[in-house]
A protein has these predicted regions:
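Hydrophobic, proline/glycine-rich low-complexity stretches
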Residues: 1-105
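HotDog/MaoC-like acyl-thioester-processing domains
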Residues: 2-20, 89-174, 242-281
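A contiguous, surface-exposed recognition patch within enzymatic or periplasmic domains that forms
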Residues: 5-48, 161-215, 222-225
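Generic secondary-structure boundary/loop-capping signal
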Residues: 23, 52-55, 64, 75, ...
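Short, surface-exposed helix-loop/turn micro-motifs enriched in polar/charged residues
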Residues: 44-47, 124, 231-232
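Generic structural "secondary-structure junction" signal
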Residues: 57, 90, 96, 102, ...
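Catalytic-pocket segment enriched in acidic/His residues
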Residues: 199-258, 262-276
Length: 281
């Protein structure tokens, strides 16, 4: 994949360095709702927030008139303009120092580190890398890099590599209720997760799309549940292709050495998302 030279047309470099600061309270109410959504026991005030549950906090509180047709916040402020492209959360990475603590305020400092246009097999793709630094009571907790891709409307990919042999495995069949509740608890208005006519007619998917962050959460916690005595150091993940409503999703992984694991999520058509977990030695 080679970078194109049409960045000047989009003025992409103007967004590099954009910064915003968001404060939120890691409130127990939302924590309980996420636990109910995922079907797990809820931690309590004063306890660590489970990894990746921070995605339900620090969300922009916008009026409906400030959302685009797809349900995302209108871009062109902090984020670059979409220019008729579909926006996707393609993957990311996190480096953990300490967890956020439930019941205390926290801050997320966000900076656009890079914006680049590349030419892929389906046409022009715009990749945006956003760095988030999370602090609580003046202490740095962890750093996240989020990878966003803007792509031209094209039919989604349906097949991928066969899943490797797993050391641990569980499965879930996401329901429309799960997708709706995860959208609600993360304040995610993206219509591909709950609006069937929109996702099929406008964006070309076969059915409602399972959230990439939800799958990353399932993949990471599948690994953590298999190794409860290990301490999480880092996690990176990448979407391979979409999963949709009704897919029987396998959440799997394998240790490659004492401190590293490969994790993935697959369905009958192959790998959907893959990631790497690193534990503290």
């Amino acid at each position: 994949m080679q970078a194109t030279t049409s960045n000047s047309e989009l003025n992409l470099s103007e967004w590099i360095g954009n910064h915003q600061n968001t404060q939120d309270s890691i409130c127990e109410v939302l924590v309980r709702r996420m636990a109910a959504t995922l079907g797990v026991t809820s931690p309590k005030i004063g306890e660590p927030l489970p990894a990746l549950w921070h995605w339900m906090f620090f969300q922009p509180e916008l009026n409906n008139t400030e959302l685009g047709e797809d349900g995302h916040p209108q871009v062109g402020g902090f984020m670059p303009p979409a220019l008729g492209r579909n926006r996707m959360w393609a993957g990311g990475s996190l480096e953990f120092s300490q967890p956020l603590i439930i019941g205390k305020p926290a801050t997320c400092d966000s900076t656009i580190e890079n914006v680049v246009e590349k030419q892929g097999s389906t046409g022009s793709l715009v990749f945006v890398t956003v760095r988030h630094d999370y602090t609580q009571e003046g202490e740095h907790k962890f750093t996240e890099r989020q990878n966003i891709v803007y792509r031209l409307p094209t039919p989604p990919k349906h097949t991928s590599d066969t899943a490797p042999k797993a050391q641990w495995s569980t499965h879930v069949t996401p329901s429309s209720t799960l997708l709706f509740r995860y959208s609600a608890v993360t304040f995610n208005g993206h219509r591909i997760h709950y609006d069937y006519p929109y996702v099929t007619d406008t964006e070309g998917y076969d059915n409602l799309v399972v959230h990439g962050p939800l799958m990353a959460t399932l993949a990471l916690h599948g690994c953590l549940n298999a190794h409860p005595n290990k301490v999480l150091k880092s996690f990176k993940y990448r979407g391979v292709r979409p999963a949709t409503l009704g897919d029987d999703i396998h959440i799997e992984g394998t240790m490659i050495n004492d401190s590293q694991a490969d994790v993935w999520i697959s369905n009958d058509n192959g790998v959907i998302q893959q990631g790497q977990v690193e534990f503290a030695v």
